[in-house]
């Protein structure tokens, strides 16, 4: 046995004391009282904030504190609660729910918390973490909407124009082409994004809430095939994801859009659809034992959507002049727009595009009900050339619908009425458009000019679509300078009008021959 001299003992003790360091980890923890249906009741966590992220070390899951009560905290779980047990530990993170934002997300598919789910590995590039649920900009940092956001769809750009920074509701029954309008709008931004100018580009964010995974996969494939995925982000909280993820996904995606808005860029966010977010929120609220209101929705379901949609804005020049445009979708039951959630969202947004089942089945696609659709921004969101041709269309279509209803009962019609009916039928045909074939604004102007100035009056109704196709092909070969002039001058000048009239006259003879 080694002998230690008394003189050395004090040295050894000093060395031991000098190296003695026990790491202490101080964390506020709580205990699960009960868990089930994606909700955990937690005892403890006295200082937790509302909306704070909490961790369940035992199962590796995370959750968000929503109900702060006297003796416990109601936590919604962002995952499967199967591995959680009564008595398990819960710890605070001290941070409110944050999501990654920035250009690194472009071209990626992420979940409601911003984690990539497309199998392409982690996010690469500059990522900025932002709070998912933030206050909307006030009154002074905003300016009125005055810059067009081209959807590439004639019926919308001409009749219910949407501006950058606007909130336009897409509302209709299931299977009426709501998602098709959203995809077309995203695809239509390809030409403006190809310019590579951040002040003009429009980055797109598609939020899938409560949809089938196969539907989301098909949508991503469509965006990839059309080359639109490179300037888009897809945020997916599918039907198999827990209700808290479906509730959070729109806010997380909105934070991603706000990154572009607040850095002087432009973004478009589409929520498909907010009816399912309201259902997920209702489920969470009822399980948290919050008092139910109309249709069993909680009392703050209006605030759920208003605080989300108010974050879409056109910022003033002092704040970078960026914008975030929102296209929320609401699914109606049997065309009932007077139900609770539809009326809420209609009152929050700056107008709505109303899609009708009857029109869809009659082959009028996009099935836009022109009478029921409105844009509260109006012609401020159109270039002058579009105003010049679109002004008459709405009136002519309204008169046509009225005449068509009366003409069913009348046997002999005067020539003026017959002419109006003929023109209206051709305009309805002209506003039809196949999926994923958006038109540039100058192409739309030329087509609508032909419709409103009587150049298609002699064309048989069933030949209108082929007339349009051939006209566009002809314009791209023999009328390039007309298109270029409308694109750069953004109006139909006297000189342009003469050239376009001559072009359409000669094309009409060629088409008839």
Curated annotation (Swiss-Prot):
Indicate the enzyme's highest-level EC class: translocase
**Protein name stated in the entry:** ATP synthase subunit alpha
| Summary of subunit composition and partner proteins | F-type ATPases have 2 components, CF(1) - the catalytic core - and CF(0) - the membrane proton channel. CF(1) has five subunits: alpha(3), beta(3), gamma(1), delta(1), epsilon(1). CF(0) has three main subunits: a(1), b(2) and c(9-12). The alpha and beta chains form an alternating ring which encloses part of the gamma chain. CF(1) is attached to CF(0) by a central stalk formed by the gamma and epsilon chains, while a peripheral stalk is formed by the delta and b chains.
Binding-site positions, ATP: 172-179
Q: Which gene encodes it?
A: atpA
Any single GO molecular-function term of the entry would be:
proton-transporting ATP synthase activity, rotational mechanism
- This chain's source organism reads Gluconacetobacter diazotrophicus (strain ATCC 49037 / DSM 5601 / CCUG 37298 / CIP 103539 / LMG 7603 / PAl5)
Reactions this protein catalyses:
ATP + H2O + 4 H(+)(in) = ADP + phosphate + 5 H(+)(out)
Q: Does the keyword Membrane apply?
A: yes
Provide the Gene Ontology terms for cellular component. plasma membrane; proton-transporting ATP synthase complex
Task: Give the record's keywords alphabetically.
Answer: ATP synthesis, ATP-binding, Cell inner membrane, Cell membrane, CF(1), Hydrogen ion transport, Ion transport, Membrane, Nucleotide-binding, Translocase, Transport
Q: What is its EC number?
A: 7.1.2.2
- Where is the site labelled Required for activity? 373
The subcellular location is:
Cell inner membrane
Protein role: Produces ATP from ADP in the presence of a proton gradient across the membrane. The alpha chain is a regulatory subunit.
Q: How does it sit in the membrane?
A: Peripheral membrane protein
Chief subcellular location equals membrane
**InterPro entries from the entry?**
ATP_synth_asu-like_sf, ATP_synth_asu_C, ATP_synth_asu_C_sf, ATP_synth_F1_a_nt-bd_dom, ATP_synth_F1_asu, ATPase_a/bsu_AS, ATPase_F1/V1/A1_a/bsu_N, ATPase_F1/V1/A1_a/bsu_N_sf
Q: Which domain of life is it from?
A: Bacteria
- Keyword presence, Flavoprotein: no
UniProt similarity note: Belongs to the ATPase alpha/beta chains family.
């Amino acid at each position: 046995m080694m002998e230690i001299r008394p003189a050395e003992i004090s040295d050894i003790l000093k060395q031991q004391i000098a190296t003695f360091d026990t790491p202490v980890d101080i964390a506020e923890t709580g205990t699960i009282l009960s868990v089930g249906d994606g909700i955990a009741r937690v005892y403890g966590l006295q200082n937790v904030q509302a909306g704070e992220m909490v961790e369940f070390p035992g199962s590796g899951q995370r959750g968000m504190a929503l109900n702060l009560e006297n003796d416990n905290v109601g936590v919604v779980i962002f995952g499967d609660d199967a591995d959680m047990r009564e008595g398990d530990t819960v710890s605070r993170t001290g941070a409110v729910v944050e999501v990654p934002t920035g250009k690194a997300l472009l071209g990626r598919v992420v979940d409601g918390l911003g984690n990539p789910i497309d199998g392409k590995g982690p996010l690469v590039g500059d990522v900025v973490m932002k709070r998912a649920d933030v206050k909307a900009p006030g009154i002074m940092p905003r300016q009125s909407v005055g810059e067009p956001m081209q959807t590439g769809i004639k019926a919308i750009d001409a009749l219910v124009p949407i501006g950058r920074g606007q909130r336009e509701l897409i509302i209709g029954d299931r299977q009426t082409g709501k998602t098709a309008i959203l995809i077309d709008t995203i695809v239509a931004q390809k030409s403006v994004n190809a310019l590579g100018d951040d002040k003009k580009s429009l980055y797109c964010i598609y939020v899938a809430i409560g949809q089938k995974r196969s539907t989301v996969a098909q949508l991503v494939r469509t965006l990839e095939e059309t080359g639109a995925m490179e300037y888009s982000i897809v945020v997916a909280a599918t039907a198999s994801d827990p209700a808290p993820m479906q509730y959070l996904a729109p806010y997380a995606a909105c934070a991603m859009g706000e990154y572009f808005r607040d850095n002087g860029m432009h973004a478009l966010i589409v929520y498909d659809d907010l009816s399912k977010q309201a259902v997920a929120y209702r489920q969470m609220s009822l399980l948290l034992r919050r008092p139910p209101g109309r249709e069993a929705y909680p009392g703050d379901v209006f605030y759920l959507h208003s605080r989300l949609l108010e974050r879409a804005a056109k910022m003033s020049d002092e704040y970078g002049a960026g914008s975030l445009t929102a296209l929320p979708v609401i699914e109606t039951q049997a065309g009932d727009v007077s139900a609770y959630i539809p009326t809420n969202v209609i009152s929050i947004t700056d107008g709505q595009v109303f899609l009708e089942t009857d029109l869809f089945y009659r082959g009028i696609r996009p099935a836009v009900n022109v009478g029921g659709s409105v844009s509260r921004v109006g012609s401020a969101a159109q270039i002058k050339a579009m105003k010049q041709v679109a002004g008459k269309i709405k009136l002519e279509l309204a008169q046509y619908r009225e005449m068509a209803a009366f003409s069913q009962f009348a046997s002999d019609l005067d020539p003026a009425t017959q002419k109006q009916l003929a023109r209206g039928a051709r305009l309805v045909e002209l506003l039809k458009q196949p999926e994923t074939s958006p038109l540039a604004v100058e192409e739309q102007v030329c087509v609508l000019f032909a419709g409103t100035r009587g150049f298609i009056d002699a064309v048989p109704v069933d030949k209108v679509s082929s007339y349009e196709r051939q006209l566009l092909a002809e314009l791209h070969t023999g009328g390039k300078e007309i298109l270029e002039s409308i694109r750069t001058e953004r109006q139909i000048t006297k000189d342009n009008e003469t050239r376009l009239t001559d072009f359409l006259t000669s094309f009409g003879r060629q088409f008839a021959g």
